[in-house]
Amino acid sequence: MNEMNGENVQTANHTSEVMRRFNQAFQRHEPEALTELVAEDCIIENTQPAPNGSRHVGRQACLAVWQGLAGESGTHFEPEEVFVSGDRAIIRWRYFWGAGERNSVRGVNLMRVRGGQIIEAMGYVKSSS
């Protein structure tokens, strides 16, 4: 394996670990676990409103969005698949706010990690309209 491939593998391993911890924070309702995972220059393009979603810039703004969601009682988050390539990840998920699929939405997050922290997240959901 050449040096570049080794660096890519190491980067992917770091990205995988950040995604594991990120998903775990939502599954366990541990919003405080997100604090060290979000970079100062993080940007979220949220799922709503259409067509572009709301934009949240900076660590505190991104933490407010994600910690609010992770701490919401009566909900649960199920990652269906996580794909990592270098510093990028795709999370396919389902979010439940009640019992059964009627009370859920499926979506995808496109993530980017740098230095062990999330710097970019773009969210997309399947709409009922």
Where are the regions that the model predicts?
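Short charge-dense sequence patches
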Residues: 11-21, 42-43, 57-62, 117-121
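A solvent-exposed, acidic/Ser-Thr-rich amphipathic alpha-helical stretch
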Residues: 31, 36-86
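Small-side-chain structural scaffolding
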Residues: 25-33, 42, 89-90, 107, ...
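A beta-strand edge to alpha-helix "cap/lid" segment located at domain peripheries
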Residues: 2-10, 63-129
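Short, low-complexity N-terminal intrinsically disordered segments enriched in polar/charged residues
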Residues: 1-40
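Proteins with a high burden of low-complexity, intrinsically disordered sequence enriched in S/T/G/P/A and R
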Residues: 12-15, 49-50, 129
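Residues at structural and domain junctions
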Residues: 5-8, 20, 48-52, 97
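Alpha-helix C-capping/helix-to-loop hinge sites
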Residues: 22-25, 45, 76, 96-97
